[in-house]
């Protein structure tokens, strides 16, 4: 995975956690962040990328 994209995901997950969001809310925010950073990615691809980071 692209390290910059991974950083976007980790930052979004951290921000969502700090805001008190649950797992689903954190994932949703991270997917939106991925789509802003990489508009060429579909929602499905963005979700896959977020899930890969969750598993690490």
Language-model segments: what does each one mean?
Residues 1-56:
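C-terminal alpha-helical interaction appendages
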């Amino acid at each position: 995975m692209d390290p910059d994209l991974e950083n976007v995901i980790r930052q979004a997950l951290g921000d969502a956690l700090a805001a008190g969001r649950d797992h689903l809310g954190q994932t949703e925010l991270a997917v939106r962040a991925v789509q802003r950073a990489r508009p060429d990615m579909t929602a499905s691809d963005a979700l896959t990328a977020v899930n890969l980071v969750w598993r690490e």
